[in-house]
Amino acid sequence: MNTVRLREILRQTDMATHRDSQQSPLKVLVADLTSETFSVIDSCGDWFGRYGAVLGYAIRLWGEFCTENENPVVIAAGKKRTAIVFRNPGTELVTFNTVSSSFGAELNGCGYCALVITGHLKRSGAVVVDGVEKHCVLSEKLRNARVSQVNLFFRNCGECLATGPSADNGIHFAAACLSGKITGRGGLGFRLGEKNLKAVVIHAASINDVRESIEQRDSANLSLLTEQAYRNGWAAVSNFRRRTDPRMFHLTEREANRRLAEYQGLFPDTASVIMLGSNCDCYDIVSIADRFNLCFDLGLDPVSTGNVIGWLLDASRRNVINITGFTGEDSEAVMQLIEDMAMRSGIGGILGSGTGFLASSCSDAASSFCIHGVECGPVDFRGSFASALNSAAENYFPVFFEMESGLCSKHPVFWTVLNEDLVLGYESLGLDPETEIRTLTTVSALKLKHAGSSEKYAKKIFGWNSDAAETGRNVWQLLNGINGVAGKIEYKIPDYFITDSDSDFPEPAVVPFSRLFDEYMTMRGYLYKEVVVNEK
């Protein structure tokens, strides 16, 4: 990375997003893994005012610590949200994961607003931080350890961000796990594996009340979001087969919990159910949950893993490759394949590179993001590259332009940008967008007929604080400025896609995705100057 250019971009962005702030300097803990030393620095308090205290702040810190030879991982703490910023191994662009967890509250309790991790350990180990001391723990027992084994190793030591063997073996879609959840897509596990870092353990005072309330809220939000997504046709059903199989409709959160009343283990999120289920010809929720739990324990992103298996099955049907005898319904074979991916064993060694690499190797590049005119990823339309969207909104709008409501049908691009800004803004302010942004779960109840100023409508109709949208725009500008230096931003998307027939819509709708995306980029190019909407 050209660090001279990066510093200039950061300076320009800081000037363009200037906002007076009375925030005093914030304490940041820096862990140098190479020397196994720790230091505490005072970071710029003005960044707090421009970019918020969590996500935006972490992105700005990443830019400050990045050099030509250093890819830092930055963890910023809020009391309810934790943001982790890193460089995607597939695209080399800066991306992030956010999660509701007491991890951030623990870090705050130790007196720090953020943790910056640089360098790499000599062998597998962990960073342990508590209110008294900071140290690195090295142990060969952690090498190729599963997430459950890592958590057991550090039991009673505090909140643990852990990786599995997929991170040790350089799988591009390796993920990290925290508080019983995958932190997100984008290859965080891979980046931690590069640093030989199996875990980050934080412990402060007892905050069980915070942890319990977070878990209860997450459960309620997931249930509501899943139900609304299926009802309104936001979620894909079987995207490798034009997403039309109605059987997946019955695997909503409520129905799945009823079926799994006696099941011991984690319950997969909506996208994981789709990718490890219908895309792999499996409609048994218990089998899907077993696959999800195995992915979690191995530190594999379940959505990307399902995408790889789905591509493999589809490529076999089209005689692009030959995998005689393997079917998605054979759960034993699928479970073995998932384990082979994490350990880079047999065919899993190739599959671990992701479908972008696989399709290119098979001269089948078009299907890496578009099969039969439909994109692969139900959540991330570039999911074949095992990378998250640059936008925080990916977790809340499974497909931006698939929504056909009174709110979005006339001006989908405007409302996409608005919601993206609000998600980025609330994430940066340490709030949960699922709770704060009501359009994400109740769009069908909104009857707005036209769009206007984002500030005006956000404040007047929803009671949103306009500072959230402004902060989100600042963060978007910062992230895309950094990524303009970090790597080449490519938007590989299909020309169109078809909405689910298993929804309230009488007929599948063809959405001109490329045209809408061009409009989106044009609007973003003006950085939210006054939007003129044609009401005709």
Feature roles, as predicted:
Residues 2-22:
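Short, Gly/Pro- and small/polar-rich lid/capping loops
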Residues 47-105, 109-187, 268, 272-290, ...:
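Conserved mixed alpha/beta core segments that line enzyme active sites in large multi-domain catalysts
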